[in-house]
Amino acid sequence: MIKFSMAKLAMFTLSLQLASGCVSSMDRGISTSDDIYSDSEYYEKYENATRGGDLIKKFEILYRMHATYLSPEFSNALVKRAQKLYLEDTGGAFQEASSKAGFIVTIYGLERESVDLSNTAHWTVLFESKEGPVKPILVKKLNDKIRWRNFFATMSPWTSDYLIVFDRAAVNPSASNLVEKPKTRLVLANGDGKIQLDW
């Protein structure tokens, strides 16, 4: 039988408290950056701009997809976060989508070849608004995951990530000064099914 004295228990508790305090550098001039979830100003805009879902068939997740709408409101938050993290203006990071409707889409699928959104023989990508559906003018694979996963929580080593741009004006779908909420829908479809993401 093990006997614990109050002194031993107090020493053990104190050692745990001291050890848990060493989770970041104590050196002067060194600081860690907030992750996406800790940057409350950015995270709120990110959450409002991001939609996602799973395409499930016969109890199997075939695709897990998320899209972040590069609305003017979110784009401003992205630029501010980039200035905090990288101490530079990355306003031109997604220059292709600066005045157009653009999305960052992350997709995971069991087969690597099946998640190539730029392959129009396998995927149909549409932007639906009150003017009707349009196909993208740009589907560009993002390769710099190390940089962009600091901005998009759904990016991982297992996802394929794309910048998708449509020839439509970008709007803030939740802006309070709008008389009528604009229809903003991204549709991703292939032979297995489709997913519609609404803002």
How would you label these PLM feature ranges?
Residues M1-A10:
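Bacterial N-terminal signal peptides that target proteins for export
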Residues V23-W199:
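Conserved functional micro-motifs across diverse proteins
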